[in-house]
C-alpha cells in the first residue's frame, strides 16, 4: 500500500470540494463533502495508476507545496 498527497480546495461558486493529486496526470476530482471527495480521489487515483502499470517510475515525483508571500 502506498500513500499519496492530495491538494484540496473548496470552490464557493460550485459549492464543491476539488482535489488534485500532484504528479499523477489526470488524478483530479470533486465532491460535495470531504468524505465524498476522498472516496472519489481514491477511485480516480487507482484508475490513473492502472494506466501507468509498467511505467510508474516514469511518473513525476511530488516534492511538496510551498507558501509564496506577496504584497497585494
Regions found by a protein language model. Give the residues of each.
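Structural detector for hydrophobic anchor residues on beta-strands
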Residues: 4, 17, 27-29
Amino acid at each position: 500500500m502506498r500513500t499519496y498527497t492530495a491538494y484540496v480546495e473548496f470552490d464557493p461558486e460550485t459549492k464543491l470540494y476539488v482535489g488534485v493529486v500532484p504528479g499523477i496526470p489526470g488524478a483530479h476530482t470533486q465532491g460535495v463533502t470531504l468524505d465524498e471527495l476522498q472516496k472519489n480521489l481514491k477511485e480516480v487515483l487507482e484508475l490513473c495508476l492502472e494506466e501507468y502499470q509498467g511505467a510508474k517510475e516514469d511518473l513525476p515525483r511530488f516534492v511538496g507545496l510551498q507558501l509564496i508571500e506577496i504584497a497585494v
